[in-house]
């Protein structure tokens, strides 16, 4: 990994941590609207950005989670699993919006791991918790997609030619 990639991932992690700190009351437990999750869409433009986001998740959970030990395992694990699904699917999907849709669904569905975490740690009902955390994740990722699309046009303009847009 080159210095530029490492520096960029460091900045991504720092932004993730800072945004999570600002919205801390809404970023944990059974009803979550962790706005920093919209950064997950960065992986659509460069797979290596997943490193910065996972580091951000790790440190945000370490610093702010009320159930640190669980969140370091399940929270980070959920991010890694969702990124793996997205990255593998990107081999077959070239359209940026389609990639963002798959990424949104990957993160939404894998919130089942967070529901399991909250059941084990706090005794929350699994299915209801999966529903509420998945809704929060979907809302943040879906509303964040246009913002990250605009950011992506600056980060990876090569992805926005007609071949990748399905035109």
Tell me what each language-model feature is.
Residues 25-30, 58-167:
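Membrane-embedded alpha-helical hairpins and interfacial helices in multi-pass inner-membrane proteins
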Residues 53-57:
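Extracytosolic (periplasmic/ER-lumenal) interhelical loops and adjacent juxtamembrane/interface segments
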Residues 1-51:
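Hydrophobic transmembrane alpha-helices
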């Amino acid at each position: 990994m080159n210095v530029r990639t490492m520096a960029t991932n460091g900045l991504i992690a720092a932004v993730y941590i800072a945004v999570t700190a600002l919205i801390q009351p809404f970023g944990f437990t059974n009803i979550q609207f962790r706005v920093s999750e919209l950064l997950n869409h960065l992986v659509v433009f460069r797979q290596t950005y997943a490193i910065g986001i996972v580091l951000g998740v790790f440190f945000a959970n370490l610093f702010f989670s009320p159930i640190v030990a669980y969140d370091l395992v399940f929270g980070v694990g959920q991010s890694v699993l969702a990124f793996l699904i997205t990255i593998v699917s990107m081999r077959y999907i070239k359209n940026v919006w389609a990639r963002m849709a798959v990424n949104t669904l990957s993160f939404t569905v894998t919130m089942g791991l967070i529901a399991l975490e909250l059941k084990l740690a706090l005794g929350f009902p699994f299915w209801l918790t999966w529903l509420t955390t998945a809704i929060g994740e979907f809302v943040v990722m879906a509303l964040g997609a246009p913002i990250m699309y605009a950011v992506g046009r600056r980060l990876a303009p090569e992805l926005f030619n007609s071949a990748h847009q399905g035109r």
